[in-house]
């Protein structure tokens, strides 16, 4: 006498077969790019998510490095650790490659690397020292609001 499977087990096996079909034939279903760390999400069925990066223990598998500039490349590029890095010294042969446009329009002085002091921040990626002064708000207490001249 053959043992019959319950409905939930047969449904699970069918979903596993669908996932195996998708992995061998990726032209079916849809592929969704995740968050730019080299991860690709496949939206095939309810079971496929458990075998993908975001549902595993770590999400850093096969991730690109920061030099690839994918995902949050703007935040990574303008991070304080990258801005404070000193620029390379000018070459002794640099004047041979200097253009008229550069001499006319790019005459900015190099910025000092010591101008950034770490300010209090509200979350790990927040960098208030990069905000221009007009966007920095000064908090006023109730006392300051009551007794200030303005």
From Swiss-Prot:
Pfam families per record: CFAP68
Keywords: Cell projection, Cilium, Cytoplasm, Cytoskeleton, Flagellum, Nucleus
Chain positions covered by the region annotation Mn 1: 99-110
Any Gene Ontology CC annotation: axoneme
Main localization of the protein described in the UniProt heading: cytoplasm
InterPro entries: CFAP68, CFAP68/107
Compartment(s): Cytoplasm, Cytoskeleton, Cilium axoneme; Cytoplasm, Cytoskeleton, Flagellum axoneme; Nucleus; Cell projection, Cilium
GO BP field: flagellated sperm motility
Region of interest (Mn 2), ranges: 140-150
Taxonomic superkingdom: Eukaryota
Family: Belongs to the CFAP68 family.
Its biological purpose: Microtubule inner protein (MIP) part of the dynein-decorated doublet microtubules (DMTs) in cilia axoneme, which is required for motile cilia beating.
The protein's assembly and partners: Microtubule inner protein component of sperm flagellar doublet microtubules.
Protein known as: Cilia- and flagella-associated protein 68
Species assigned in the record: Macaca fascicularis
Gene symbol of the encoding locus: CFAP68
